[in-house]
Amino acid sequence: MARLATITLVVADYDEAIAFFVERVGFELVEDTSLSDGKRWVVVAPRGGAGAHVLLARAAGEEQRAVIGRQAGGRVGFFLETDELADDHARMAAAGVSFLEEPRTERYGKVVVFEDLYGNRWDLLEPRSGSPRS
């Protein structure tokens, strides 16, 4: 069976994106390999190795720069699941992550929306036990 292994997030700068995801969100840097022409293969992922990895791809050209921060058209485009929403919310907020709301409870679990350093929206989600998402 196939599984989603990596998604691409277009960024303005490799190092500022690494700093945000590692220092503020709490991801780990999986790989940072130099390629030709100043390009790098930069991969971050949630600590513990669960879920898909995120390839941080520096924008090349106007078309790619235009989508930075709007890769889901202003909607929540990324979903980060946790077992401890309250703890992760507090830690991330203290680290400077911008949350757009207070945590709330939905029928599928607890959720709060945050923005990455470019304005892409993410759900931090603690699925309810037994929900289709858990």
Place the predicted regions along the sequence by residue.
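Conserved beta-strand-loop-alpha-helix junction that forms the acyl-donor binding cleft
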Residues: 11-14
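Vicinal oxygen chelate
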Residues: 1-8, 28-81, 87-117, 125-134
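Conserved active-site tyrosine of GNAT-family acetyltransferases
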Residues: 17-22, 92, 119
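Short Gly/charged-rich anion-binding patches and loops
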Residues: 16-17, 87
